[in-house]
Swiss-Prot record:
Keyword DNA-binding: no
InterPro entries: TANGO2
Gene this protein is translated from: Tango2
Keyword terms, alphabetized: Cytoplasm, Golgi apparatus, Mitochondrion
Job description of the protein: May be involved in lipid homeostasis.
Tissues of expression: Expressed in fetal liver, lung, heart and kidney. In brain, detected in the olfactory bulb, neocortex and cerebellum. Elevated in mitral cells and minimally expressed in bulb interneurons. In the cortex, restricted to the upper portion of layer 5. In the cerebellum, excluded from Purkinje cells but expressed in granule cells.
Name this polypeptide is given: Transport and Golgi organization 2 homolog
Organism: Mus musculus (Mouse)
Localisation per UniProt entry: Cytoplasm; Mitochondrion; Golgi apparatus
PANTHER family with a match to the protein in the record: SER/THR-RICH PROTEIN T10 IN DGCR REGION (PTHR17985), TRANSPORT AND GOLGI ORGANIZATION PROTEIN 2 HOMOLOG (PTHR17985:SF8)
UniProt record similarity statement: Belongs to the Tango2 family.
A GO CC term assigned to this protein in UniProt: mitochondrion
Length: 276
């Protein structure tokens, strides 16, 4: 289970406004090996965490490059996983390293969607000179990817904007923080967005999540019903905030759990300016 909230406006009216504000949680088993976010790839142009699970190493759930490519992934809640399916994390890694634009890449992915367990992917080209393009594809939804219109979106483990209660609740909190963003110091905005991502209020009952996950036992589904998931061996282990301002300056903040210990966290922030 993961969750992403984002707002994008390629041409903000105010010079103090952000072109992109993104807040995301990675939910995963605490013992799944991964690397904290850092730069990698040709000329160290890509910034992301990396999955280090055997057979899936090198994939990622969220990343951005200095060239302005951004990718984000969530899994689709389904009871039965195909054990021989390809690793979904490669979808983001391949986009970040490719020369394809976001829509062309997702069109290619859509022809191969059947090779993977359920997923959603956001792919974006962020360009200060040409304008920003953000696209979406889910292999359990429409057969073709779509180009998103500027606005505010929520994505969890169903299709984009599926009204799970926790998604609607978290999106409202996200929008309240975003509405103040121009007046807030950047560090205060990041703190408020991290507060949104760490909200553990279960949004129950939720017929939508129960219907999609009907083969799961109820206590498990109930654990998934908050923005921040907290179980004994599984849950939210990474918070990420990405801000892109009107001039293409990127602030990437990652807060990650250390050593499978829910009381120990490390926060790192990276900043750079888009090359495009």
């Amino acid at each position: 289970m993961c969750i992403i909230f984002f707002k994008f406006d390629p041409r903000p009216v105010s010079k103090n406004a952000y072109r992109l504000i993104l807040a995301a949680n990675r939910d995963e088993f605490y013992n799944r090996p991964s690397k904290l976010a850092d730069f990698w790839g040709n000329n160290s142009e890509i910034l992301s965490g990396l999955d280090m699970e055997e057979g899936k190493a090198g994939g990622t759930w969220l990343g951005i490059s200095t060239r302005g490519k951004l990718g984000a992934l969530t899994n689709y809640l389904q009871p039965r996983q195909e054990p021989d399916a390809r690793g979904r994390g490669e979808l983001v890694s391949h986009f970040l390293t490719s020369d394809m634009d976001s829509l062309s890449y997702l069109k290619k992915v859509s022809t191969e969607g059947h090779l993977y367990n359920g997923f959603n992917i956001i792919a974006a080209d962020l360009s200060t000179s040409k304008g920003d393009v953000v696209c979406y594809y889910g292999n359990r939804g429409e057969p073709e990817p779509i180009v998103l219109t500027p606005g505010t979106y929520g994505l969890s483990n169903a299709l984009l904007e599926t009204p799970w209660k926790k998604l609607c609740f978290g999106k409202q909190l996200f929008m309240e923080a975003v509405e103040q963003s121009e007046a807030l110091p950047k560090d205060v905005l990041v703190t408020q967005l991290l507060d949104v991502l760490n909200n553990e209020e279960a949004q129950l009952p939720d017929p939508a999540i129960e219907d999609q996950g009907q083969e799961y036992v109820q206590p498990i589904l109930n654990k998934y019903a908050a923005v921040c998931v907290r179980c004994a061996t599984y849950g939210t282990r990474t918070n990420t905030i990405i801000l892109v301002d009107a001039n293409g300056h990127v602030t990437f903040t990652e807060r990650s759990m250390l050593d499978k210990d829910t009381s120990r966290w490390e926060t790192n922030t990276y900043e750079f300016t888009l090359q495009s």
